[in-house]
Swiss-Prot record:
The modification N6-(pyridoxal phosphate)lysine is found at residue 100. Pfam families: PALP (PF00291). The lineage of its organism: Archaea, Thermoproteota, Thermoprotei, Thermoproteales, Thermoproteaceae. It catalyses: (1S,2R)-1-C-(indol-3-yl)glycerol 3-phosphate + L-serine = D-glyceraldehyde 3-phosphate + L-tryptophan + H2O. InterPro entries: Trp_synth_b-like, Trp_synth_b_CS, Trp_synth_beta, Trp_synth_beta/beta-like, TrpB-like_PALP, TrpB-like_PALP_sf. Pathway: Amino-acid biosynthesis; L-tryptophan biosynthesis; L-tryptophan from chorismate: step 5/5. Its cofactor is pyridoxal 5'-phosphate. The beta subunit is responsible for the synthesis of L-tryptophan from indole and L-serine. NCBIfam families: PRK12391.1, trpB_rel. This is Tryptophan synthase beta chain. It comes from Pyrobaculum arsenaticum (strain DSM 13514 / JCM 11321 / PZ6). Its EC number is 4.2.1.20.
Amino acid sequence: MVDRWYNIAADLPAVLAPPKDPDEGESRIGLLTRILPSALIDQEFSAERWITVPEEVRDAYRRVGRPTPLLRAEGLERALGTGVRIYYKYEGVLPVGSHKLNTALAQAYYAKADGAVEVATETGAGQWGMAVSLAAALFGLKAVVFMTRSSYNSKRQRLTFMRTYGATVYPSPSEVTEAGRRHYRPDHPGSLGIAISEAVEYVLSGEKRHYLPGSVLEFVLMHQTVIGLEAVRQLPEEPDAAVACVGGGSNFAGFTYPMIGMKLRGEGFDKTRFVAVEAEAAPKLTKGEYKYDFPDAVGILPMIKMYTLGHDYVPPPVHAAGLRYHGAAPSLSLLRKLGIVEPLSYPQEEVMKAAVLFARTEGIVPAPESAHAIRAVLDLAKKLPRGSVIAFNLSGHGLLDSDAYEKFL
């Protein structure tokens, strides 16, 4: 069992740009102390390479099934016939069906330790909302989730399971908050940026509430490194390419950062390419601008330097709702800027074809988000020499995404 999280800030070849306040208005940086547990703020700005995982969180990891398996995609290899070996880390075995639980458990623990009785968050496809709902239940907290309206209407099964875990769920934009009312109309698809604004506003409007972010912030990425730290131990050989999908960056970071850190320190993975795969509907790494921008739609949170499409960008509704985000985490953005991470983007049709192929060859129905990584793996397997090795993170299953598969098939 992993007993430390990895913080890539200690090994970055350039200084990570700090959050900053906008030129006008109250301090957003000061706002963080009102919405986040103090331990998480310390982690966000830490330069320490290793952060100890509290025993209570390690126990929770054991309860939900960590470590997760690393598997070889032998069926997919045979179907492709390229002579490339393919491994995948499978986070879908966790109770909520995705990697999101890794940081939800940690954040719920710190919120409880900080005296919170209620937590609030945003969710796109519902994986993060489910993770927060379960983590809150396990640590005795109430949970409120603002779910992008397009997913609230289409991902009804995840909505049901969030409520099963005890959460209150609102479609976003909602009429519950001023941020929601500003964008509200019944046919608005919502965005993660708007949902973040609603969750933060909700936390600020009450007592003993904390906000739990699902991605983008550095401590979220740090908690997810349990994935990559396990994978480094499990991989029988170093890959020529390590691949994961990107929404805000926590899934990609969780799988690749321990490997990237070793490469930066000269301790291994020298030949490995790190490939970040995003949805064509939200191509922040491939088409965005590297600049300071708000991580939420309304501008409640501090500005961070990242690749962004603009905080007012509303991506079109797609099956991979968890990737419908306008920006990427600061550390991931810096690594992309430095050329250490290679970005790719794919249209929905190509991604769903890859998802179906994987289901028919490996027996696992992948989440549409995770299928973006599979799409890239198929292309890489055709381009790399025989005998090459690819490893990717299968961040979640798609058993609760039947609507996406039904529309595609």
